[in-house]
Amino acid sequence: MLPSPSVHMASPPPSLNMASHPPSPATASRKRFQDSSKKIMNPSFADLPSSLIEEIMLLLVLKDNIRASAACKSWYEAGVSVRVVDKHPWLMCFPKRGNLFEFRDPLHWKLHTLDLPELAESTVCYSRFGWLLMRKASSNDVFFFNPFSRDIISLPMCELDFQQIAFSCPPTSDDCVLLAIKFVPGEVNRVTVSTCNPGATKWITNDFPTFLRLFYMQSNLVYRRDRFYCFNAEGTLYSFEPSYREWSYICADKLRCPYVHENQYMWCGKAVFLVEKKGELFVMFTCSNEKPMVYKLFSMKWKELSRTTLDGMTFFVSFYNSELRNNLPWMRNNVYFSRFGYNRKHCVSFSFDESRYNTPKEWEQWVELCPPQSLWIDTPKNVLDYFL
């Protein structure tokens, strides 16, 4: 028998679809051109340079920064890198006796204390930039005191029995100036103003006639663009320029708040607060348990702000000072008063978003939202290192 011939199976030729030849340079170049053309025809904000995105984010307020950060990863990274959140002040409470002062963070409300014998037999007059402006109870001596660094800056005796006093910037600055004012009724109403600088040997005092009807309720003093401002409940904003010794009260249209001018609020406890933030002026009226009314000065005219136009602002008001913050996302659209709430577990606040006090039932028994035993004070970054 003849042997069977061996059978050799030849492999089929490779399919054109299975071939894996590298693309030619011309094909790769054409693909890159097509991808580039698609990007040009359909641009994406995600493709912007990170430096440009950061410049855009820097122009946005915190609320808009957070919204824009949700667009994509590159916008989120840029938004977080430039995001600035304001630091809220703390509540400082003065003891009825002794030298142990209480400090509370309005968010966490944990009690901290400082023993400050330097403030014995003194009363507070004003606070800003972390400094207290104090006056000795037994004399007319006034002085600056920083409760955290314990620094004291003495001032010459102030002979004016002032009603309001304030300072322009930290007393360690060469530009710091103090203003004390007193309204004096008479046949011709007048205002007496005294100014001083840290390091000066005396106060400079002047009298100015004022044609305003002296009103029972004045706001606190604030400093804005080389002038001190004050507001009275009758609706008049007046100012003093210390360099030129210029007193002025025709600087804005009168503001007629219904809490002051309508009879239904006649017997309610009221207060008025003036607030400055980055050169802008705000006025707030409170009236018993009614919603606080906030106005902003636009081109010398007052405009009432609503919940939507407040733009997330947070107010901190006290008998001695008023503060405003723009970038506090967890405290936005609120007013914090320098008064303890029920069982001293929090401070009284009002939410414009919820249109109510916190909590509503607590407020029924109160008239004075800002008692003279407490104020808001700016704290250093390492504030917890200073406490007992």
UniProtKB/Swiss-Prot annotation:
Pfam families: Beta-prop_KIB1-4, F-box. It comes from the Eukaryota. Signal peptide: none annotated. Residues 1-30 are annotated as: Disordered. InterPro entries: F-box-like_dom_sf, F-box_dom, KIB1-4_b-propeller. Residues 42-88 form the F-box domain. PANTHER family: F-BOX DOMAIN-CONTAINING PROTEIN, TRANSMEMBRANE PROTEIN. This is F-box protein At4g00893. It comes from Arabidopsis thaliana (Mouse-ear cress). The lineage of its organism: Eukaryota, Viridiplantae, Streptophyta, Embryophyta, Tracheophyta.
